């Protein structure tokens, strides 16, 4: 069971991943939570660079890919040991943020993602969709025009991916309550894996 959570900052994905982890653990599943960028010792160093330093869009993409490649090795090991792996961001983030937001192009980012991940695709992705205005309000960044425009492109990237991969990506309305979103997450997980309740 490999599940990823996607969405722009302020969408509520980190909350939902924690709630799903608790839900699965209560049902006896071994659960591993990881995040991107990061998730490994070297990945966390890369995360620090990405958060603290100005880099070009291409350098940003390559740093994400390097972090992801290291993490995939661990994810494969956990999956082989029967863990449910829950990941806060994965390849769809790069397509949305670098491909659409930074305008590097969807196809090239997808090709590089495939190389970095050895083709490891999540079983299920929850994209928590929230409009940019709401996300910025939640993050306290309402007056950042350049951020707003960038995030509009990112959101569009996510929506394009959701339309292209409806069998994998479940779109959830991020404006609803935490409890309502969690109910939908649980319903979809139970539907796919027939968990004992």
From Swiss-Prot:
Keyword Thylakoid: no
One Gene Ontology biological process: dTDP biosynthetic process
A GO MF term: dTMP kinase activity
Transmembrane segments: none
Reaction(s) this enzyme catalyzes, per UniProt: dTMP + ATP = dTDP + ADP
EC numbers for this chain: 2.7.4.9
Alphabetic keyword roster: ATP-binding, Kinase, Nucleotide biosynthesis, Nucleotide-binding, Transferase
Domain of life: Bacteria
A Pfam match: Thymidylate_kin
InterPro entries: P-loop_NTPase, Thymidylate_kin-like_dom, Thymidylate_kin_CS, Thymidylate_kinase
Record's function text: Phosphorylation of dTMP to form dTDP in both de novo and salvage pathways of dTTP synthesis.
Stored HAMAP family: Thymidylate_kinase (MF_00165)
Family classification: Belongs to the thymidylate kinase family.
UniProt protein name: Thymidylate kinase
Taxonomic source organism: Thermotoga sp. (strain RQ2)
Taxonomic classification: Bacteria, Thermotogati, Thermotogota, Thermotogae, Thermotogales
């Amino acid at each position: 069971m490999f599940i990823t959570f996607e969405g722009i900052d302020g969408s509520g994905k980190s909350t939902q991943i924690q709630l799903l982890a608790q839900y699965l653990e209560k049902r006896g599943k071994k659960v591993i939570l990881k995040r991107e960028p990061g998730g490994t010792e070297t990945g966390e160093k890369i995360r620090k660079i990405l958060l603290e330093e100005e880099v070009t869009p291409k350098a940003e993409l390559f740093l994400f890919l390097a972090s992801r490649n290291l993490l995939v090795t661990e994810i494969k090991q956990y999956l082989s040991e029967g863990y449910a792996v829950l990941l806060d961001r994965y390849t769809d983030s790069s397509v949305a943020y670098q491909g659409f937001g930074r305008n590097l192009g969807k196809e090239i980012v997808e090709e590089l993602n495939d190389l970095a991940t050895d083709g490891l695709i999540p079983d299920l992705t929850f994209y928590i969709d929230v409009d940019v205005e709401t996300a910025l309000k939640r993050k306290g960044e309402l007056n950042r025009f350049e951020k707003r425009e960038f995030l509009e492109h990112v959101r569009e990237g996510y929506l394009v991916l959701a339309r292209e991969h409806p069998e994998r990506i479940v779109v959830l309305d991020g404006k609803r309550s935490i409890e309502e979103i969690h109910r939908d997450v649980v319903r979809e997980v139970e539907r796919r894996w027939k968990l004992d309740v």
